[in-house]
Amino acid sequence: MAETIKIKLVKSKIGTLPKQRQNLEALGLKKIGQVVEQKDNPQIRGMIDKVSHLVQVIE
């Protein structure tokens, strides 16, 4: 596995559940098209799984 992973927000968080919005905030994603770099670990992967319909993983 790589040390870091890039995550891009591709869909709006409007209409999502509060837990999903909290996951996006924890990942550091606020605006559509924003790309953040996070450590590649099981915790981050779990957050990505919860909002997989809103984000795109760039490896």
From Swiss-Prot:
<protein>
    <recommendedName>
        <fullName>Large ribosomal subunit protein uL30</fullName>
    </recommendedName>
</protein>
<comment type="similarity">
    <text>Belongs to the universal ribosomal protein uL30 family.</text>
</comment>
<comment type="subunit">
    <text>Part of the 50S ribosomal subunit.</text>
</comment>
<dbReference type="GO" id="GO:0003735">
    <property type="term" value="F:structural constituent of ribosome"/>
</dbReference>
<keyword id="KW-0687">Ribonucleoprotein</keyword>
<dbReference type="GO" id="GO:0006412">
    <property type="term" value="P:translation"/>
</dbReference>
<keyword id="KW-0689">Ribosomal protein</keyword>
<dbReference type="GO" id="GO:0022625">
    <property type="term" value="C:cytosolic large ribosomal subunit"/>
</dbReference>
<dbReference type="InterPro" id="IPR036919">
    <property type="entry name" value="Ribo_uL30_ferredoxin-like_sf"/>
</dbReference>
<dbReference type="InterPro" id="IPR005996">
    <property type="entry name" value="Ribosomal_uL30_bac-type"/>
</dbReference>
<dbReference type="InterPro" id="IPR016082">
    <property type="entry name" value="Ribosomal_uL30_ferredoxin-like"/>
</dbReference>
<dbReference type="Pfam" id="PF00327">
    <property type="entry name" value="Ribosomal_L30"/>
</dbReference>
